Amino acid sequence: MTAQNPNLAALSAAGVSVWLDDLSRDRLRSGNLQELIDTKSVVGVTTNPSIFQKALSEGHTYDAQIAELAARGADVDATIRTVTTDDVRSACDVLVPQWEDSDGVDGRVSIEVDPRLAHETEKTIQQAIELWKIVDRPNLFIKIPATKAGLPAISAVLAEGISVNVTLIFSVQRYREVMDAYLTGMEKARQAGHSLSKIHSVASFFVSRVDTEIDKRLDRIGSRQALELRGQAGVANARLAYATYREVFEDSDRYRSLKVDGARVQRPLWASTGVKNPDYSDTLYVTELVAPHTVNTMPEKTIDAVADHGVIQGDTVTGTASDAQAVFDQLGAIGIDLTDVFAVLEEEGVRKFEASWNELLQETRAHLDTAAQ
């Protein structure tokens, strides 16, 4: 049997599920995904429009399938739907052993609804149900953004018995609304007669983008106190989110009543954990966010960094909420408008995924045009 990397094995033993934030057909065909499962403790996969756009634009892996779809008269949207759901279905199949071994907690693959629907509740619900049926795998997650329009969609999709990955969460306030949407969805699922133990959810809390935005504002202020706070907000924000998670899923009567009927916790997932600032440790958003019942989805570069030199020292989150709040108090005191920061990040997050989706449309259209010649 192949040995797991000790650093990543230690991370897993501390209660953090290691997921890969990437997917391509090359990765599936080459056996690379299976290799990461066997040697780097990977037990899940997340995707987004940027990842699929990158996969489609590199090489010729998809040419034959797109040519076949073009011959059948498939349009751009249908082609994207087929190509992406085929990859996700294949990844789901690769991860079945991890899904079975974890009683459905891990072995998960996420696919995102069209980001152009981020502010349209009913269309998001409709597409989530369609994607669930097309992929047709029990270890699938449907990714729905935590926009105001996304929140009721999350509840409605969970109520259908569909597992959901809530994405683009930046603030603790919005995270509370996400947990409320989860509990509402599970209550409706119970009323509809669904088996609650089979419905899973994670809440994807974005980390590095918070530092990127706040550091930019701290640099503009330029005082010594401001500069000393650089690189602290992302981790502090996530630690406050974890304290809020425990408050809801360990202490609330509302969750307890669902737990009796088999409902699982909605695990926090640390997303955007690739370090963007070269001044910071490239394992910062992994080693500083170790906590039980969490997921960390990482680009392969970050997984490799943790494997090579990540120092895992057990739980680095529980009991840190007061220190994390102190960081936020200091940020507020020197003039950082956190409400504005989180609003900007949500809007920017949706816009980035929309831009990637539009690039994916253009890339696919070019492939279809080439195939038709």
UniProtKB/Swiss-Prot annotation:
Pathway: Carbohydrate degradation; pentose phosphate pathway; D-glyceraldehyde 3-phosphate and beta-D-fructose 6-phosphate from D-ribose 5-phosphate and D-xylulose 5-phosphate (non-oxidative stage): step 2/3. One of its GO terms (biological process) is carbohydrate metabolic process. One of its GO terms (molecular function) is transaldolase activity. CDD domains: Transaldolase_like. The active site is at 143 (schiff-base intermediate with substrate). HAMAP family: Transaldolase_2. This is Transaldolase. It comes from Mycobacterium tuberculosis (strain ATCC 25618 / H37Rv). The gene is tal.
